């Protein structure tokens, strides 16, 4: 018994919490294991509760070339590559749409005309504004073009990340912690397939195939509107350097350790 990733939100609601042991979550295309759901995680996902309206905007960074997905991105921009027969950007917009989020901004550069044509149809349902970079601005530089258009707090996401979580809970964490920027992380395990030698002044130690655990950046962020004040000019700016600017101006940066229930598009084999 298992659940396909694209059916997770729909089918998980019907799972009996008390009788649930372990349910694998499988990618439909590759048939690979993505996650495992148990009763504790099902409770944490909180998908049974009625979703409340989320009063935020969403910025989707869609200007990159998607070089890790060549040759497919030489034809289509990465946001339009399908995950289980549905463009990645639709997965992102639809998930926020479940929380009645209607205000979206999409930053464009590579193959922008294709994306603008596609998003024009989606704009009939939700308010989707496109912001075109005349030259690549990095993962945070285009925020300068939007800073005067944003009226409230917002989620910022890469266009290649799909997260199945309760966005209300994520935003509540951001507000409770009084963060200006919340970086959404996931716990990942990396097993080194070799013995690792540790040489120190007091001796030698070897660990056989150690497993390392880290909290990694998912590419999802929650930001308060006030943090955009650190952007003084239009420039190329990676998100790491944006965080350094936030620290310089005494903005509070925190992390959200989430359930690892996310998918990166570049992990998919077509």
Range-by-range predicted roles:
Residues 51-115:
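N-terminal glycine-rich phosphate-binding loop and ensuing alpha1 helix
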């Amino acid at each position: 018994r298992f659940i396909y990733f694209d059916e997770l939100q729909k089918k998980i609601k019907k799972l009996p919490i008390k009788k649930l042991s372990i349910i694998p979550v499988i990618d439909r295309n590759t048939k690979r294991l993505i996650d495992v759901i148990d009763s504790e995680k099902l409770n944490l996902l909180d998908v049974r509760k009625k979703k409340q309206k989320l009063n935020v905007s969403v910025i989707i960074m869609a200007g990159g070339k998607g070089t890790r997905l060549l040759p497919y991105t030489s034809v289509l921009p990465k946001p339009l590559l399908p995950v289980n027969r549905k463009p990645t950007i639709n997965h992102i917009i639809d998930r926020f749409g479940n929380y009645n989020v209607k205000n979206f901004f999409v930053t464009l550069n590579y193959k922008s005309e294709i994306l603008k044509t596609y998003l024009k149809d989606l704009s009939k349902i939700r308010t989707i504004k496109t912001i075109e970079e005349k030259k690549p601005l990095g993962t945070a530089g285009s925020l300068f073009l939007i800073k005067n258009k944003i009226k409230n707090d917002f989620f910022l996401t890469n266009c290649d990340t799909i997260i199945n979580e309760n966005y209300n809970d994520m935003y509540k964490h951001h507000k409770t912690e009084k963060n200006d920027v919340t970086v959404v992380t996931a716990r990942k395990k990396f097993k080194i397939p070799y013995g690792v030698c540790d040489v120190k002044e007091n001796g030698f130690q070897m660990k056989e195939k150690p497993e390392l655990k880290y909290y990694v950046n998912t590419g999802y962020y929650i930001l308060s509107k006030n943090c955009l004040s650190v952007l003084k000019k239009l420039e190329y700016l990676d998100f790491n350097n944006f965080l350094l600017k936030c620290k310089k101006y005494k903005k509070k940066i925190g992390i959200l350790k989430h359930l690892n229930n996310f998918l990166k598009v570049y992990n998919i084999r077509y």
